[in-house]
Amino acid sequence: YITTEVKNGKLYIKTENNVNLKPSDWKNGIYITVPIKKISGISLSGSGDIVSKTTIKTEKLETVMSGSGDITLNVEASAVSASMSGSGDITLSGNTTDFSATISGSGDIKAFDLVADNVEATVSGSADIKVTANKILNARVSGSGDITYRGNPEKLDTKTAGSGDISKD
């Protein structure tokens, strides 16, 4: 009932059309393990979870989520981007030079434990982003969402529109 397909170097894992999976034991759920040697992107749509069991080491990693699922990753990369629409959570840890976080909806990007030199964070809606920036932080909020940061960035550029807030933790 689960299909896998590789298109243009991308692995797609999904259920067959009109199939709704129900595990025989809800406590244990359904797990799919994907061993990787090289990866540049992770995308989740729907209500599943993606969890890295080890540190993902790559040059550039893009995470995209739409829906109510959760992504939890430990990353070592030169550049990391996280974008979300919906009500899920993206939780990131590790190290990167450049981190970009964009969120619309009511989800959260929790990246206090992803230490970055340069951070660009954009919130629209009621979502929250938590980041650590060492050199540069560009933060934008429109709506009621918040951006909270750690670190002592040398350059801080912030703008808010609405009741949202940008603050140091």
What are these regions (language model features)?
Residues 1-45, 49-64, 74-79, 91-98, ...:
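Acidic (Asp/Glu) and glycine-rich low-complexity loops/linkers
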Residues 61-63, 83-84, 140-142, 159:
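Short, surface-exposed linear segments at secondary-structure transitions and domain or protein termini
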Residues 70, 81-83, 89:
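Mid-length scaffold segments of soluble, non-membrane domains
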Residues 90-169:
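Short, surface-exposed interaction patches in beta-rich subdomains
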